[in-house]
Amino acid sequence: MYLLIDVGNSRIKWLYGNKVPSTIEAVSYKQDWQMKLIRAWHLLPEPEAIALSSVNKAEITTTIEEIVRQLWHKTVKIFVSQKQTNHTLTVVYQKPEKLGSDRYLAMLGARSLCHDPLCVVGCGTAITLDAVDGDGRHLGGFILPGMRLAENALLQNTQKLVPMRWTPHLLGNDTASCISAGIHHALPAGVDHIIDELEGQCGYYFKRFAFGGDAQILFGNRPTYRIEPDLIFGGMFAHLSPPKQV
């Protein structure tokens, strides 16, 4: 069994198992997350291996490594984006280690599900998109503010507090619902537009995957998108798998 850990911007998620889907647990940084990890992991049988992806501060990774050492006297494998992985994915970045490990693992996870050209959309603090062709070549990507960042940008100079209400309606009828409608519809529409343009340039269609905490809100009602909440963990398993023979 593996213990796989995803250190995000707002919470830590982990999976104990040998495949996806499996039960995924999480703790917010607003809680006493160190103690919760110790209490939860103390109940687990010793994992065969422990691996971690992080987009947060190095101090959090260091704390988790210390917890793992205390519990099992094991080291933690830290995922870093690579130029080539198991004959499955080739990253376009000149310095692949600069690519966020969450984006890298999400592409690997999608490639484990589909070998067609694909786009992977991350829906968290930021909206990220990465495109991969049918041969596993990473074509590049983009990053936009996520829902909460967009909301904060609109409200930061507002004198009064505006309680947000997420709405499926195209138009709002007060300030809160107008902001909600704008963000809710503009973000996925912008992503759609970029993918449509990319398809026109490349001359073929891309399968569309979405993952992250806001994936269902933003893309759940769009039938062209496949919502895969466990995509990063799927990428971890793909990375840890033995290389395929070619």
UniProtKB/Swiss-Prot annotation:
Listed A to Z, the keywords are: ATP-binding, Coenzyme A biosynthesis, Cytoplasm, Kinase, Nucleotide-binding, Potassium, Transferase
The GO molecular function terms of this record are: ATP binding; pantothenate kinase activity
Keyword Cytoplasm attached:
yes
Residues annotated for substrate binding in this entry = Y93, G100, S101, D102, R103, T175
* Top-level taxon of origin: Bacteria
Q: Which terms under GO biological process does the entry name?
A: coenzyme A biosynthetic process
Free-text comment on the cofactor? A monovalent cation. Ammonium or potassium.
Subunit structure comment from the entry:
Homodimer.
Query: How is this protein named in the record?
Result: Type III pantothenate kinase
Q: Which gene encodes it?
A: coaX
